Every structure is written in C-alpha cells, then in structure tokens.
Amino acid sequence: MGIIDTFVITAVTVIIFCLLIYAAYKRYKCIPSPDDRDKVLKSTLNDDTLFNQTLTPDQVKALHRLVTSSI
C-alpha cells in the first residue's frame, strides 16, 4: 500500500503543478502588452466625444448638471 499511496500523491502533485502552469500561461497570453494598452487608450480618447472637444454647449450644460447633481 505504501508504493500506491506514494504514486497517487506524486500523480496528484504533478497534475496540480501542470494545472498551475497552464493557468499562468493562459493568464499571460490574455494580458495585452503595454503597447496594445496605449494604442487602445489613444484610440478611445480620440474617438470619444468627451475627450476630443466636439460637445455642443447644450451637451456641456447637461453633463455639468449631471455631475453637480450626483455630488
């Protein structure tokens, strides 16, 4: 029984270790690089009407009312 117990413990340890390595690999693969994040941020800021100064005066007033009423 001692050899079987040792084998089971070793097998479970190896499986857990492999799952941890796989999870770390998947996490690393899904995280975008800093260059990608900068590109996404710049494109978002350029396309968003709040940041590219294309709001009409009425939209600015409405935004101001929204912010001041929420405080």
Curated annotation (Swiss-Prot):
Keyword Thylakoid: no
GO cellular component, one term: membrane
Coiled coil (residue ranges): none
InterPro entries according to UniProt: Chordopox_A13L (IPR009236)
Domain of life from the UniProt record: Viruses
Inducing stimuli: Expressed in the late phase of the viral replicative cycle.
Compartmental location: Virion membrane
Keyword ATP-binding carried by entry: no
Virion surface membrane side: 22-70
Membrane topology annotation: Single-pass membrane protein
Chain segments annotated as transmembrane: 1-21
Name of this chain's protein: Virion membrane protein A13 homolog
Organism: Fowlpox virus (strain NVSL)
